């Protein structure tokens, strides 16, 4: 039976060959010949070799110009013209040998040179030494780390907290710990560089909405909702995150958190709140933007902040529910693979928290000074104030750009230099121009601290006004 079947198949093939159109047979024949040629032909052809004479070799060597090891850099680049600070960057700072009032460092609560903080750090140094020489999971966890995490969780009124040894890596590690490829992140276009690096590491689908524009965010959420309805199976495994800052580093503006919380529950998203600038600043007790708006901490899925501003230490922390925070102990890259925070800095942060809890009036003092400098800087010729009146970090931008970013930077730097000559230390906001997703305009950053007196605030405002008139008019 098998032989008969094989003969029948052969007969059908021959019959099909006779019935096939001529062009079909020609095409198949060409393809067969092409395949045979590809199989037996060589992948390359040997070219006739032509040896160069010694004279020709020497001429080629003399003509050859090597590429520079590094790209050419302008002599006016800020990295090549840095200021040298002598001593701690406290209320009064010595820059290039000249003593100035510090309006550049983020020492909001003036704790950097606080005697209690320094004494605690010295005591911890004698007990633990300088560093830990290992990550938290490899003999890098000291009792003072656990104490600090407990204190931070208690202060923020959350279940648990986790600390990182570097402020920048905190949010940059937290985002990719939860959001992976295939997930969707809705992020404010003015997000700081640390958030941008976290987004990049997550490999998630990033959707930017206009700065503090709740309507634009809802538009994106609605579009995603429509997409989810088309593919409900995929939607069930896709996580959605909203990433914002409490006070934006690049603009000094506050996020509309109440409206964001409403959108969170309406569209079933999770909120990550970066509070490096608002922690220790906003709220009656310095707990940040949630306390400022009176929003329950449970409405926020994860809060992140660094300890390098208000706490005048180093590192950062995340806080929230225990099951959320514990996930970072296994998935937070900066937590798992970096040496843990030096114990002396953890002890200093604990003492800074003690001072914040003992002196809650300090936040009202800072708020008043922020409002005063914000008001005093209004109407400066050629400059506009960008930022909320309650933000301790304001931006001064040119009212009208020259059309060239390089020229704008030079004009603002001339104002900074004149202020420095008159004893007011300021700085321009610096960015990695080629790596920023949405590059902010050039600006001068003015930082307010509780240590600055009213007379110094007014002096700074008048000095900036005079420098702007001299440079821009």
Curated annotation (Swiss-Prot):
Its EC number is 2.3.1.50. One of its GO terms (biological process) is sphinganine biosynthetic process. It comes from the Eukaryota. Residues 37-473 are cytoplasmic. This is Serine palmitoyltransferase 1. The modification Phosphotyrosine is found at residue 164. It is a single-pass membrane protein. Belongs to the class-II pyridoxal-phosphate-dependent aminotransferase family.
């Amino acid at each position: 039976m098998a032989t008969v079947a094989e003969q029948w198949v052969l007969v059908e093939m021959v019959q099909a060959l006779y019935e096939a159109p001529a062009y079909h047979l020609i095409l198949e024949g060409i393809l067969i010949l092409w395949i045979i040629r590809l199989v037996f032909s060589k992948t390359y052809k040997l070219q006739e070799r032509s040896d160069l004479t010694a004279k020709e070799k020497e001429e080629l060597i003399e003509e050859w110009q090597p590429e520079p090891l590094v790209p050419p850099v302008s002599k006016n680049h800020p990295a090549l013209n840095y200021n040298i600070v002598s001593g701690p960057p406290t209320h009064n700072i010595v820059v290039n040998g000249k003593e100035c009032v510090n309006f550049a460092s983020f020492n909001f609560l003036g704790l950097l040179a606080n005697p209690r903080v320094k004494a605690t750090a010295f005591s911890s140094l004698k007990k633990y030494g300088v560093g830990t020489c290992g990550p938290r999971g490899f003999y890098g966890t000291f009792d003072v780390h656990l104490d600090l995490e407990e204190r931070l969780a208690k202060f923020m009124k959350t279940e648990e907290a986790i600390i990182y040894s570097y402020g920048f890596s905190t949010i940059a590690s937290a985002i990719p710990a939860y959001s992976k490829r295939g997930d969707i992140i809705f992020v404010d276009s003015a997000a700081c560089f640390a958030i941008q690096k976290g987004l990049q590491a997550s490999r998630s689908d990033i959707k930017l909405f206009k700065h503090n524009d709740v309507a634009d965010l809802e538009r994106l959420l609605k579009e995603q909702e429509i997409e989810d309805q088309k593919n409900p199976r995929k939607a069930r495994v896709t996580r959605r995150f909203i990433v914002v800052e409490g006070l934006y580093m690049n603009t000094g503006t506050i996020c509309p958190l109440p409206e964001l919380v409403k959108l969170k529950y309406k569209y079933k998203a999770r909120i990550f709140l970066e509070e490096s600038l608002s922690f220790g600043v906003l709220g009656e007790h310095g707990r940040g933007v949630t306390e400022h708006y009176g929003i329950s901490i449970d409405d926020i899925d994860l809060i992140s902040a660094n300890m390098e501003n208000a706490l005048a230490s180093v590192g950062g922390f995340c806080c929230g529910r225990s099951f959320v925070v514990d996930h970072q102990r296994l998935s937070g890259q900066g937590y798992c693979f970096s040496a843990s925070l030096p114990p002396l800095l953890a002890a200093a942060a604990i003492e800074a928290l003690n001072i914040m809890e003992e002196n809650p009036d300090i936040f009202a003092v800072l708020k008043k000074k922020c409002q005063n400098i914000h008001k005093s800087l209004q109407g400066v010729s050629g400059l506009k104030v960008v930022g909320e009146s309650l933000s301790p970090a304001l931006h001064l931008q040119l009212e009208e750009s020259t059309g060239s970013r390089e020229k704008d930077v030079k004009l603002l730097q001339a104002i900074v230099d004149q202020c420095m000559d008159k004893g007011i230390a300021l700085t321009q906001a610096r960015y990695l121009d080629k790596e920023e997703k949405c590059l902010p305009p050039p600006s001068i950053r003015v930082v307010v601290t509780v240590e600055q007196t009213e007379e110094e605030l007014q002096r700074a405002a008048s000095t900036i006004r005079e420098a702007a008139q001299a440079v821009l008019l």
